[in-house]
Amino acid sequence: MLALVTLSGNAQTKKKTTTAVEQISITAEATLNPQQKVTAHMKAGSYEGPIGIKLRGNSSLSFNQKKYTLELRDESGKDVATSLLGMPAHSDWVLLAPYNDVSMVRDPLAFQLWREMGHWGPRTTMVELIMDGEYQGIYILSEAIKRGKDRVDLNKMKKSDTKGRDVTGGYLLRIDTFNEDDATFTSKIPGIGDGIMTSQIIWSCIYPKKKNLQPEQFAYIQNFVDSMEQAIQGKDYLDPEKGYAHFINVESFVDYFIHTELSLNADGYKRSAYFYKEKQHEDGTGGKLHAGPVWDYNLAYGNCNFCNANNIEAWCFEGGNTNPTPAFWQRLLQDPAFRKAVKTRYKELRKTILSEKHIYEYIDEHAKLVAPATDRHFKEYPELLVSPEKAKASQQPSKVQEGFGMFGRGGFGGFGGFGMGDGNFQFDPVGMFANYRVSSYEEEITVLKKWLADRLAFLDKNIERFDKDWQPRIQEPVEKKMQFPGGFPGGFPGGFPGGSPNGGFPSGGFPGGGFPGGGGFPAFPGSR
């Protein structure tokens, strides 16, 4: 069933919406913002009570369709665990806006595949949102990545857990950009790729939260990650006692590699990349680092034009063009035993979970579910679709072209998202990142399936060689390459003389030279 979410504010006139699907109504007491949660009241199925709600995202805040973080609360304002729309009880939830994913299935598909591979992944329910009586389109109501028995099932840490076995876990970590709300540290091992936005691999401790994290706990988890990364890069990295197998849960890293490479996620490995560390067992075993859960796949499955994501015959782990990829992925792939484990697991999954039949069935079920609401969604956001002629032109083979490097045919961030239109500068966040465009929802589903078939064919051919003659391409550490940490401060004063490929910049480049505001590249959407 497709649920309908209704969001209204006290200061606004409420409109009655007639719908055959379930409604979730939220009444906010103040204007929503991304800094702090606003108190609101929500009715969602059997749940009715107070919540906290805030906007979420970075550059996606500029999108017409916003994303939201929800926290269920009791009357005193304390967070309370409650089931929503049939999903297990918890206090923390997310309304993901699939604005730059016309299929609206990429995040749910990624989460579903990860769960079917045997790991915890966020459960989702498709909903529609009405804000202050105005239709806001189709949303994904998702579990947030949090510690809990029905989420990431980690040992609950107390502030007194500062030594011995108690300090060993559990921890929830993320590799991403810097976030002042988290306790962060920087990897001592340089990442690989071009890394034009940053040269650093930044680890954040998500659980325990920064306000609860004790100095001894932070020191422990930082030292553990440092030791793990040093061991993987060391001369004894294959040794079962001194090498990487002593620190990581190898099976989870194998699955994470397969899952990420199938998706060719532009953010893969380097942004919204979660890990968790379990508490050591009494007998001294366990306590290893697990890869996952997976998160943030709106720029995956052929839906982006940078970080190798526009090249269906490329490896995702090599696509560190914006943020660097952690070097340990390249190093793990140098181990014949790790590659053999990948091949064995991949061939097993191809017979079931990763078969075209299984994946297509999930996509078709999802498309059937949202189909009755797509007309409303695209009426609200007509910019998501283009003419059949433009769609056809954009769907030509999209391997990275010689001479454009990471920019591919669409330019960095799709330079096709920038244009002069009637002579005025325009910013199109959809075209900015899109690897292709479509003229209808049905066409999007068809293109997505074709992309998946082609991607699986590439993986079939190359992973078959993993225990034979295949070796990863060794890339230099990103610190040895040219960096633009703050973007290109002056932009491209002269632009591309002939305009950018795929219809991006007009001849002569940006008016006034550079990006809007002179701030370099805009931030990327979708993180956290």
Q: Where would I find each of the regions flagged by the language model?
A:
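Hydrophobic h-region of N-terminal signal peptides that target proteins for export
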Residues: 2-9
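N-terminal module-boundary/linker segments of secreted carbohydrate-active enzymes
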Residues: 12-45
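Short, flexible loop/turn elements at secondary-structure junctions
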Residues: 28-30, 55-57, 74, 97-99, ...
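Conserved oxyanion/phosphate-binding beta-strand-loop segments in alpha/beta enzyme cores
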Residues: 42-97, 214-219
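Middle-to-C-terminal accessory/interaction subdomains
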Residues: 59, 63-64, 183, 199-270, ...
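Structural recognition of the beta-strand scaffold that forms the well-ordered cores
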Residues: 68-71, 91-97, 104, 128, ...
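Internal "kinase-insert"/substrate-recognition segments embedded within catalytic cores
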Residues: 74-77, 90, 97, 118-120, ...
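A conserved helix-loop-beta module that forms one wall/lid of the active-site cleft
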Residues: 98-132
